[in-house]
């Protein structure tokens, strides 16, 4: 290129730049050509990858910094498989966390700059204060916190019931009042049940309040009726006398519970009592009461009232009792069926409780009664398909057993908190009464 041409090009370029710099020009400004410093060529002291900066006292990459931030406090790793002689880099992956942490510490990484408790909500700093209430002050929950009368604590009263046991033994020794010639044991038990259930044609007394004397009369009546009923059981009479007493002591309250349910159902059917009342018999006298309004005096055995003791059991016992009575009304068991239900319930419970020879004995008695019940359905009732009826009978018994279990749990709870201040000469007899 000639000198004249170069001069022309230079002049032309200068004119163009002057036009671009003029205020009226709309052309864009030239780009910023500031020189950017070259990225640092330092490597991570831990893994020798390109470093990001200084983290926790060492020049590291972001990955190693995050690793140390995560595991710098716990330092809880599995032992090294190569005795702390791992190669630190294998295709970009550290195979041993323990050796990686040791390398971090060797190059001076520390936890001094770690930041903790940066969350706006810190439960550790909250002042959790339990309000000072009567429950927290006394150390007892409101469920069992009662206002017992002052001066109620003292020596326990002793109740001797040996006379009751002696009377039951005497009844068993005397046997049944009248010998009966029947085809099987179940029929004889049905006859005995009719004899001991007492009159059910009219009401003798309506009970509104009951105390120590009335409670012991009920217990005595139920225990003696059970003993008298067992005298109609020939196979039971052949057992050793000690075994008879042991079985009687363990089941008399179950007999009273199931028999009273059946008696109440029969009384409601005959309109002898209202639908919200229950019935029982004491000394051939029919007694009825409304459990919702019945006053029970427990001052002779406890420093708490009956209403206060209801806090030990939130289950609606009265509703459960109505369910059982209605189920018995729908079933309308015959005396043979009711006798079998009572025996099955009593023998099952006493066998489960006493085990050993008693369990084997009651299982044999149940087998005899089961065969008699089969003969009763097939030969007398002409009902060979009776499985549904058996299922309804066992459903009632199972419900009674569930109530019995709840009573035992409640009794254990009352024992822990020393609700009753009495001692009985035979505590096992009245455990679930």
Curated annotation (Swiss-Prot):
SMART domains, per this entry?
Answer: HOLI (SM00430), ZnF_C4 (SM00399)
Enumerate the GO terms in the molecular function aspect: DNA-binding transcription factor activity; RNA polymerase II cis-regulatory region sequence-specific DNA binding; zinc ion binding
What the entry lists under InterPro entries is as follows: C.elegans_Orphan_NR, HNF4-like_DBD, NHR-like_dom_sf, Nucl_hrmn_rcpt_lig-bd, Znf_hrmn_rcpt, Znf_NHR/GATA
Tell me which residue ranges form NR C4-type zinc fingers. 44-64, 80-104
Query: Which superkingdom heads the taxonomic lineage of this protein's source?
Result: Eukaryota
Q: Name one GO cellular component term.
A: nucleus
Q: Give me the positions annotated for DNA binding.
A: 41-116
Q: Which UniProt keywords apply?
A: DNA-binding, Metal-binding, Nucleus, Receptor, Transcription, Transcription regulation, Zinc, Zinc-finger
The main place the protein resides is: nucleus
| Claim: Secreted is one of the keywords in the record | no
Q: Which PROSITE patterns match?
A: NR_LBD, NUCLEAR_REC_DBD_1, NUCLEAR_REC_DBD_2
Which positions fall inside the NR LBD domain? Answer: 177-433
SUPFAM superfamilies recorded: Glucocorticoid receptor-like (DNA-binding domain), Nuclear receptor ligand-binding domain
Pfam families xref list: Hormone_recep (PF00104), zf-C4 (PF00105)
Q: Where in the cell is it found?
A: Nucleus
Q: What does this protein do?
A: Orphan nuclear receptor.
Q: What family does the database annotate?
A: Belongs to the nuclear hormone receptor family.
Task: State what protein this is by name.
Answer: Nuclear hormone receptor family member nhr-98
> What species was this sequence derived from?
Caenorhabditis elegans
């Amino acid at each position: 290129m000639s000198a004249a041409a170069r001069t022309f090009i230079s002049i032309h370029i200068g004119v163009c730049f002057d036009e671009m710099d003029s205020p009226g020009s709309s052309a864009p400004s030239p780009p910023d050509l500031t020189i950017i410093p070259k990225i640092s060529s330092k490597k991570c002291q831990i893994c020798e990858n390109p470093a990001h900066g200084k983290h926790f006292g060492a020049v590291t990459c972001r990955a190693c910094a995050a690793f140390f931030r995560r595991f710098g406090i716990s330092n809880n790793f599995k032992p090294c498989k190569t005795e702390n002689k791992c190669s630190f880099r294998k295709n970009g992956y550290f195979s041993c966390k323990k050796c990686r942490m040791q390398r971090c510490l060797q190059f001076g990484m520390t936890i001094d700059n770690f930041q903790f408790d940066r969350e706006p909500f810190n439960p550790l700093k909250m002042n959790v204060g339990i309000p000072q209430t009567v429950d927290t002050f006394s150390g007892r929950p409101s469920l069992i916190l009662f206002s017992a009368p002052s001066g109620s604590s003292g020596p326990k009263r002793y109740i001797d019931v040996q006379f009751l046991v002696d009377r039951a033994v005497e009844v068993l020794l005397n046997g049944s009042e009248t010998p009966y010639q029947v085809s099987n044991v179940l029929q004889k038990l049905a006859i005995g049940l009719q004899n001991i259930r007492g009159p059910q044609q009219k009401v003798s007394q309506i009970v509104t309040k009951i105390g120590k004397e009335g409670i012991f009369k009920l217990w005595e009546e139920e225990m003696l009726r059970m003993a008298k009923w067992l005298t109609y059981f020939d196979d039971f009479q052949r057992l050793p006398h000690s075994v008879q007493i042991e079985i009687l002591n363990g089941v008399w309250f179950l007999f009273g519970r199931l028999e009273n349910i059946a008696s109440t159902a029969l009384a409601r059917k005959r309109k002898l009592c209202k639908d919200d009342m229950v019935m029982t018999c004491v000394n051939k006298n029919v007694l009825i009461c409304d459990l919702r309004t019945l006053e029970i005096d427990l001052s002779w055995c406890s420093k708490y009232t009956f209403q206060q003791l209801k806090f030990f059991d939130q289950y609606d016992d009265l509703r459960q009792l109505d369910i059982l009575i209605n189920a018995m009304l729908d079933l309308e068991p015959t005396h043979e069926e009711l006798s079998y239900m009572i025996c099955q319930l009593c023998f099952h419970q006493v066998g489960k409780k006493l085990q050993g020879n008693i369990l084997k004995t009651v299982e044999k008695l149940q087998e005899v009664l089961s065969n008699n019940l089969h003969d009763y359905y097939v030969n007398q009732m002409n009902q060979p398909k009776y499985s549904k009826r058996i299922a309804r009978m066992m459903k009632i018994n199972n419900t009674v057993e569930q109530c019995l279990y709840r009573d035992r749990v409640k009794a254990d709870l009352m024992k822990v908190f020393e609700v009753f201040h009495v001692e009985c000469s035979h505590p096992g007899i009245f455990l679930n009464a």
